[in-house]
A protein has these predicted regions:
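A short helix-loop-beta-strand connector motif used in the catalytic cores of GNAT acetyltransferases and
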Residues: 75-86, 109, 279-280, 290-296, ...
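Aromatic sugar-binding interfaces of carbohydrate-active proteins
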Residues: 267-274, 279-300
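Acyl-donor binding region in acyl/amide transferases
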Residues: 55, 65, 106-277
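Short, solvent-exposed loop/turn elements at beta->coil junctions and helix N-caps
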Residues: 69-75, 285-289
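Short, flexible loop/turn elements at secondary-structure junctions
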Residues: 39-42, 89-92, 100-106, 142-147, ...
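Short amphipathic alpha-helix that is part of the acyltransferase structural core
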Residues: 27-73, 83-103
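C-terminal non-catalytic accessory extensions
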Residues: 291-325
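Conserved N-terminal entry element of GNAT/NAT acetyltransferase domains
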Residues: 3-41
Length: 325
C-alpha cells in the first residue's frame, strides 16, 4: 500500500476554540485530563487533527489507511450521525486519543437491510440481532492513543491514557442511560502479532466469551457473523495449555504464553477482556481496508460490568450537563 504524507498538525488555538465548555463531557478520574464530544459540524479543526493522529497511531501499529489523514464519510458527513469522543491534555494542549461512536437507533440501512456503518464491512448482522439488542447499542470504532502517550514519555499522563478513555465510555453510559444498553466494538490485532499468539488469543476469547446465558443475547454467535472469518487452528494444542475453567486463572496462563513469544496481549484487548464477565465475542475477521488487521467483534452490556470497573469509570465528582450532543 502506498502511504501518503501525513498532514501537518492543526494549530492549538483552533483546537482550544472548538473544545469548549459547550462540548465538555467530563473530567477524567486521574491525570487531570478532560473529555469532550464533537462532530465535524461543530469542530472541523478537531476532526482534522483526529484524522492526523489516528493515521499516525495506526501506522505505528502496522495498520492505517495509507491516506494523509484517517477520515472517512462517517467522520465528515453529518447524515451518518457519528460523534467523536475526544481525550484532551489541558497542560500540553493536545489531543491524547479518542473514540468514534454512533447510537445504532440513528443509523441508516442499505437496500439489503444491513446498517450503513463501518462494522458492516466486517460483519453481517442478522435480522434477529437488528430487531433486538442492536437498537439499544452504541457502536464504537477508531479508538486510538497518540504514540507519545503509549510509553512512559508523558509520565502519569501516559500511564492513565487508556484508563482516561474508559472514563469517557463511562460518561457515555451515564449520558445515554435509558436509551442505550450495550457497547458494540472491535478489538484490533495487528499483522505483526505472532500467528500462534493470535490463534491462542482467539481460542481464549471463544472459550470464555463465546456463549452468553442471557435470553436477549442467546446464540448471539449466530447473529453477528464475520464476513472474512479467521479460523481457529491448533485447537487440540490450546486445549492442553489453557486448561483452567476460571477466566482469571486461564488468563494468567494466556498472558504467560503470549509473553513467551516476545509480545504482550494488546492493551485494548487486555482491557476489554477484564471489563465484563459477560462480554460477548463472536469471532474475528480480516479488515482488508485497514492494512489487513484482525478485528474481533465484541458486545458488552452496561449493567454487567465488573463492579470495580463501574466504580472506577462511572463514579466521578464533576458531572457534566445532560446535553443531547
Amino acid at each position: 500500500m502506498k502511504m501518503e504524507e501525513i498532514i501537518a498538525p492543526v494549530d492549538k488555538e483552533l483546537l482550544k476554540a472548538e473544545l469548549n465548555e459547550k462540548r465538555f463531557l467530563r473530567d477524567t478520574n486521574h491525570a487531570g485530563n478532560k473529555l469532550y464530544i464533537v462532530d465535524n459540524a461543530c469542530a472541523p479543526n478537531v476532526l482534522r487533527e483526529i484524522g492526523r493522529l489516528r493515521e499516525i497511531a495506526f501506522r505505528a501499529g502496522g495498520g492505517g489507511t495509507g491516506k494523509s489523514a484517517d477520515l472517512d464519510e462517517f467522520d465528515l458527513d453529518g447524515a451518518f450521525k457519528y460523534k467523536q469522543l475526544v481525550l484532551w491534555d489541558p497542560d500540553a494542549e493536545c489531543i491524547i486519543g479518542g473514540y468514534r461512536y454512533v447510537l445504532c437507533d440513528n443509523v441508516m440501512y442499505d437496500r439489503f437491510g444491513q446498517p450503513i456503518m463501518p462494522s458492516a464491512h466486517l460483519f453481517k448482522f442478522t435480522r434477529r440481532y437488528l430487531k433486538g439488542a442492536f437498537l439499544k447499542t452504541i457502536e464504537l470504532s477508531r479508538s486510538f492513543i497518540r504514540p507519545e502517550y503509549q510509553s512512559s514519555e508523558q509520565g502519569m499522563k501516559s500511564l492513565y491514557s487508556l484508563d482516561n478513555l474508559f472514563d469517557g465510555l463511562g460518561g457515555l453510559i451515564v449520558l445515554y442511560k435509558g436509551r442505550m444498553e450495550y457497547f458494540f466494538g472491535k478489538m484490533t490485532i495487528y499483522p505483526s502479532f505472532p500467528e500462534e499468539g493470535l490463534q491462542m488469543l482467539l481460542y481464549f476469547l471463544r472459550k470464555h466469551f463465546g456463549t452468553w446465558e442471557n435470553d436477549l443475547m442467546h446464540r448471539l454467535d449466530r447473529m453477528v457473523i464475520p464476513k472474512q472469518p479467521v479460523k481457529i487452528k491448533l485447537t487440540r494444542k490450546f486445549d492442553n495449555i489453557l486448561t483452567e475453567k476460571d477466566f482469571r486463572e486461564d488468563y494468567k496462563i494466556l498472558k504467560r504464553e503470549i509473553q513467551k513469544m516476545g509480545v504482550n496481549i494488546p492493551p485494548l484487548v487486555n482491557t476489554y477482556m477484564n471489563l465484563s464477565p459477560t462480554m460477548k465475542s463472536f469471532g474475528a475477521g480480516i479488515n482488508d481496508e485497514f492494512g489487513n488487521v484482525i478485528e474481533a467483534g465484541i458486545l458488552i452490556k452496561f449493567d454487567e460490568l465488573h463492579p470495580e470497573k463501574t466504580r472506577r469509570h462511572l463514579s466521578f465528582p464533576k458531572l457534566f450537563s445532560r446535553r443531547p450532543f
